[in-house]
Design a protein with these regions (language model features):
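N-terminal beta1-alpha1 ligand-phosphate binding loop
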Residues: 3-21, 31-34
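Amide-donor transfer/coupling interface in amidating biosynthetic enzymes
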Residues: 5, 50, 102, 116-224
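Short glycine-/acidic-enriched loop or helix-start segments at secondary-structure transitions
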Residues: 14-16, 59-61, 93-96, 138-139, ...
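Flexible gly/pro-rich beta->alpha loop and the following alpha-helix that scaffold active-site loops
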Residues: 19-84
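Catalytic nucleophile loop
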Residues: 75-100
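Short, electropositive alpha-helical surface patch
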Residues: 102-108
Length: 224
């Protein structure tokens, strides 16, 4: 089965989520947001996976990139091609399908417990988060999990997304910190070294938790 991986060229790692989709038989074509002219069509593809980004959908200087990715997500959704979004992928899916995205009243950076309506699939956590934006879900969506800041998971048909990062690995968090995230984390009162220590402690548990979400998505949502 063929899947499109929508991502930034400098952060194209789908981590545990990509690993599990591959175990279910999917192969990915990377589609870099900065090089969208090279994206293939949706024809013959069975899944769209939209990853996180340090972008915000309302930034004026990425308006064309946001518009074109939103169009891909909207078209896939309308054609019944499953779409799975993570963090920024969640935000652009909300933007594409009738919800809204705005600056959150406070960022979520680190490992957080969430309130879940499907604890057998989406466990309370902890889950890793790194974002400063919040969505309102489209009116016809089913919200599945949340924190005090905002929605954490929702779905419409075969489109599903999470604000938290089920895919995250220790290597990814280290890369984000070394790529400028240390300053951002410190600005918001988070200790980068503690973020890494917490990640080392939690990834052994978060990996099977991520697998459970992908298994449910493939077996119950995609295949129905």
């Amino acid at each position: 089965m063929r899947a499109l991986l929508l991502c930034n060229y400098y952060d194209a790692d789908a981590g545990f989520v990509g690993e599990r989709f591959r175990q279910h038989g999917y192969s990915f074509t990377e589609c870099h947001r900065e090089r969208r002219a090279t994206w293939p069509s949706l024809d013959g593809h069975d899944l769209v996976l939209s990853l996180g980004s340090d972008w915000s959908v309302y930034w004026p200087h990425v308006e064309s990139e946001v518009s074109e990715e939103a169009a891909v997500i909207r078209t896939a959704h309308e054609q019944g091609i499953p779409v799975f979004g993570i963090c920024y992928g969640n935000q652009i899916m909300a933007h594409a399908l009738g919800g809204t995205v705005e600056r959150a009243r406070e960022p979520e950076i680190g490992w957080y417990e969430i309130v879940t309506d499907m604890p057998e699939v989406i466990v309370p956590g902890p889950w890793f988060q790194w974002h400063s934006d919040v969505v309102t879900v489209p009116g016809h969506a089913e919200e599945l999990a949340r924190t005090s800041v905002g929605p954490q998971a929702w779905r419409i048909g075969t489109s599903f997304c999470t604000q938290f990062h089920p895919e995250v690995t220790e290597a990814m968090v280290r890369r984000w910190i070394e790529g400028g995230g240390a300053e951002e984390a410190a600005k918001h009162g988070r200790d980068p070294d503690q973020l890494l220590a917490d990640t080392r402690r939690n990834v052994a548990e978060s990996r099977p938790n991520a697998n459970a979400i992908v298994d449910w998505y493939v077996e119950s949502v995609v295949r129905g």
